[in-house]
Amino acid sequence: MRSVKVLATLLAVLTICGVPAGASASHLSYAPERPQSGWTVGATTARGVVTDYKMERVAGVWFRVFRLRARTALLRWHVGATDPPGAWHTVPSDAGPAVNWPNEGLAGVVGVFNGGFKVGAKAGGSMVDGLTLSPMVPGDMTIAIDAAGHWRMGVWGQSLPSRSFHPIALRQNLGPLVLGGRLTSAAYANIFSWGSPLNNQPSEPRSGLGVDAAGNLIYVATMSDIGPVTLGQALLAAGVRTGMELDMNPYWPILGGSFHPLHAPGPLPVQIPYSEHDPAIYFNGWQRDFFVGLAEPNSWTCSWVSPGLTTRGLVPQPLRAVGTGCPRS
């Protein structure tokens, strides 16, 4: 069974890289992930760029933009210590309220950033490692992550769930903000439907997440006071084709990006200007859910994978390297 999974993973890697599945891996060459004009390179590996970042000015507001490259990065989702309520004591350590250094550190952490609203806000459902923490809501925008750390974003009940994508984690947060490269009509509707602001003031610091035409994952955030329309415009300016709002209000938007894969706690210099928190809080445990970006192995013929949801119920999802040219554990 393991040999079948290894072969399937290698074929998937070859397909993603645009290589004929019948070609010999020893005779293949892979184009590195290259820098792009207008972006500053963050973390790199032998594969090329893993993350990059920039500041984007939209409607007079500066946004931090952080991008995970689809060919060189993978994604994980973690619960918080207090939200979702009780999840910390139920989920395995690979999805707990702190970066799981013994396992995720093998790959190398390249970025961390906040999740969505708390469960009490009734902004959507979530699932991790086979454990449903809140029921999925039809019509809500969903970020899905599979056993290889690949991501897909779509509206639940439309493009997700999908027979071709098998998630180990799901996170919803309200309806779609960007679809087909355009703001949705809901973005212009009642501003209070996009989150409960402090002191009834609808313009607040906000964060968002989206996927561009190349499949890259893009996080945007500002500590300036904005509404959902401006957040959506920032996602569009960053190249997002499908996007959603994440958490809001001054206390919750948090981002940290490294300049190289971290195998132990280290510097995260790429941050949201004027954020209220050092992103290193995710290293030791944080109260709310968050995402972790990791680096793929240096070899194009090796990938980090977890077991997947092969049975019903809770299934821990530790990473292991599969393929050829993999790092020694």
Description of each model-found segment:
Residues 1-6:
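Positively charged n-region of N-terminal signal peptides that target proteins for export
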Residues 8-18:
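Bacterial N-terminal signal peptides
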Residues 63-67, 142, 176, 208, ...:
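Conserved hydrophobic/aromatic beta-strand scaffold that supports enzyme active sites
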Residues 178-180, 194-306:
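Extended C-terminal subregions enriched in glycine
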Residues 77-238, 309:
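Aspartyl protease catalytic domain
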Residues 17-27:
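C-terminal region of N-terminal signal peptides and the immediate post-cleavage residues
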Residues 25-135, 304-329:
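Zymogen propeptides
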